[in-house]
């Protein structure tokens, strides 16, 4: 690893998609039946429902028949956002193929895939962030310092949710709009489980890299985002917090006494002023985030910006906090997910004189997350220019076939392409590349910053 690599970080994002079949003329298919249609082309070419695709990312079926896409390793936020967008395009292409096969089988209706975190039956599915850390960082100190930030971060980057009546975390209450989709399903602060307890941070130590040098921070409290700017703020602000912790930059003692209670309290208070208990005293989400922003600005002033989007991240961070504090969301309604959705629903409520308990609002909430470019409400707003873009319009489409050029994903994608060109069976995972007929020549790629591999060249040269 070079000095330049030490200034970078590997990022990754895992997205689980909600599945629904709508059939007005017959029985709707179960999620299990839908994903069998959806993944049939994947199984045909990959011989499995768990594959690595052309851009180095992973596509597979998760628990509960949820399609999941895990981005390739990325070392810039632009790479991450583009790679994540490529997942939506890949899955939408599978939807189109699945509906054609269904029609040929005499099955009507449409398949919907949603980038959201909760369904009407009370199930939740996640959006998991991955950050590569240096092994020397004291993990207990890092997680203790990070939890208050993550608990309150939802006022910046929550996806927004229409909460039905009677589902307040601390008792009964009317239907209302909340910051987060995921908050009410969080059951623990820090845990090694991702499904049984749904913690804020998962502690399972699987670095997918040299374990003597790295570990992976796995954050699972976040909502699935749609806006590129919200992605930028989510990962950019968290990266800044991690850099401050790693550098020993003073953040103050702000330990949340009851993280799961706090994350729910904050989600249901759009003013950002609800008081949550700390180990010493109390604070609001606004106060916590204002403190972290002030610390981040001081850190950047002292150490310099480590990439060219840092200034943009700090500015947007401040703008969102101003919007929460004042209630004037006009400056962020084209970039921040919860504010984009809230404006859409508030406008609809006003036109039709509806309360938050109106079934139509719950339907619009769901449709907001549909990845179909012609049916998803967020996609329609984006196409009309009501939502701002961060990257060029073709960035995600380009990332469907192209791996991030700055990481090990490039090696993996090249290996897969060369094997398929030659009609060779292969098996790959995050760190291992293997041709089935040459099992003794498996290649291990432990450095996530490697962008080329002499071992891969030698292997294919040997069998040319």
Swiss-Prot record:
Binding residues for ATP: 58, 71, 430
| General remark | The reaction mechanism probably proceeds via the activation of Pup by phosphorylation of its C-terminal glutamate, which is then subject to nucleophilic attack by the substrate lysine, resulting in an isopeptide bond and the release of phosphate as a good leaving group.
What does the record give as the reaction this protein catalyses?
A: ATP + [prokaryotic ubiquitin-like protein]-L-glutamate + [protein]-L-lysine = ADP + phosphate + N(6)-([prokaryotic ubiquitin-like protein]-gamma-L-glutamyl)-[protein]-L-lysine
Keyword ATP-binding applies: yes
What protein name is recorded for this chain? Pup--protein ligase
Q: Where does Mg(2+) bind?
A: 14, 60, 68
**What is the active site of this protein?**
62 (proton acceptor)
Matching HAMAP family = Pup_ligase
Q: Which GO terms describe its molecular function?
A: ATP binding; ligase activity, forming carbon-nitrogen bonds; magnesium ion binding; ubiquitin-like protein transferase activity
* Gene that this sequence comes from: pafA
Which keywords does this Swiss-Prot/TrEMBL entry list? ATP-binding, Ligase, Magnesium, Metal-binding, Nucleotide-binding, Ubl conjugation pathway
Q: Which Pfam families match?
A: Pup_ligase (PF03136)
The reply on keyword Repeat is no
InterPro entries hit by this protein = Pup_ligase, Pup_ligase/deamidase
Give its E.C. classification number. Answer: 6.3.1.19
Functional summary from the UniProt entry = Catalyzes the covalent attachment of the prokaryotic ubiquitin-like protein modifier Pup to the proteasomal substrate proteins, thereby targeting them for proteasomal degradation. This tagging system is termed pupylation. The ligation reaction involves the side-chain carboxylate of the C-terminal glutamate of Pup and the side-chain amino group of a substrate lysine.
Family, per the entry? Belongs to the Pup ligase/Pup deamidase family. Pup-conjugating enzyme subfamily.
Task: Name a single GO biological process.
Answer: protein pupylation
Pathway stated in the Swiss-Prot or TrEMBL entry: Protein degradation; proteasomal Pup-dependent pathway; Protein modification; protein pupylation
């Amino acid at each position: 690893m070079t000095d330049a690599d030490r200034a970078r970080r590997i990022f990754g994002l895992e997205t689980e998609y909600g599945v629904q079949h709508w059939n007005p003329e017959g029985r709707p298919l179960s999620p299990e039946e839908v994903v069998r249609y959806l993944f049939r082309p994947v199984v045909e070419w990959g011989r499995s429902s768990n594959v690595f695709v052309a851009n180095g990312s992973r596509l597979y079926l998760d628990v509960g028949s949820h399609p999941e896409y895990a981005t390739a390793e990325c070392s810039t936020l632009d790479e991450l956002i583009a790679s994540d967008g490529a997942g939506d395009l890949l899955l939408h292409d599978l939807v189109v193929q699945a509906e054609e096969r269904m029609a040929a089988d005499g099955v009507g209706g449409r398949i919907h895939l949603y980038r959201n975190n909760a369904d009407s039956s009370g199930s939740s599915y996640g959006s998991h962030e991955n950050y590569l850390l240096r092994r020397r960082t004291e993990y207990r100190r890092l997680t203790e310092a990070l939890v208050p930030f993550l608990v309150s971060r939802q006022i910046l980057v929550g996806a927004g949710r229409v909460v039905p009546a009677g589902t307040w975390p601390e008792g009964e209450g009317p239907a209302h709009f909340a910051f987060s989709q995921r908050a009410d399903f969080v059951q623990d602060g820090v845990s090694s489980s991702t499904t049984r307890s749904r913690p804020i941070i998962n502690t399972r130590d699987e670095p997918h890299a040299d374990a003597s040098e790295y570990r992976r921070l796995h954050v699972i409290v976040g909502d699935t985002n749609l806006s590129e700017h919200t992605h930028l703020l989510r990962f950019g602000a968290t990266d800044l917090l991690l850099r401050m912790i790693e550098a020993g930059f003073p953040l103050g003692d702000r330990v949340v006494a009851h993280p799961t209670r706090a994350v729910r309290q904050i989600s249901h208070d759009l003013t950002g002023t609800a008081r949550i208990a700390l180990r010493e005293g109390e604070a609001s989400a606004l106060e916590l985030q204002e403190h972290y922003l002030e610390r981040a600005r001081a850190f950047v002033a002292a150490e310099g910006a480590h990439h060219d989007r840092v200034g943009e991240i700090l500015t947007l961070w401040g703008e969102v906090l101003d919007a929460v504090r004042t209630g004037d969301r006009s400056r962020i309604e084209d970039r921040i997910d919860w504010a984009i959705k809230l404006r859409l629903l508030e406008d609809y409520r006003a036109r039709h004189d509806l309360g938050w308990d109106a079934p139509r609002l719950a339907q619009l909430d769901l449709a907001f997350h549909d990845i179909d470019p012609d049916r998803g409400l967020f996609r329609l707003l984006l196409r009309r220019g009501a939502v701002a873009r961060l990257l060029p319009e073709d960035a995600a489409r380009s990332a469907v076939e192209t791996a991030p050029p700055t990481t090990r994903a490039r090696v993996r994608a090249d290996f897969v392409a060369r094997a398929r060109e030659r009609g060779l069976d292969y098996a790959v995972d995050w760190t291992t590349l293997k041709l089935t007929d040459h099992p003794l020549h498996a290649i291990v790629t432990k450095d996530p910053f490697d962008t080329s591999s002499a071992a891969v060249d030698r292997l294919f040269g040997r069998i040319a």
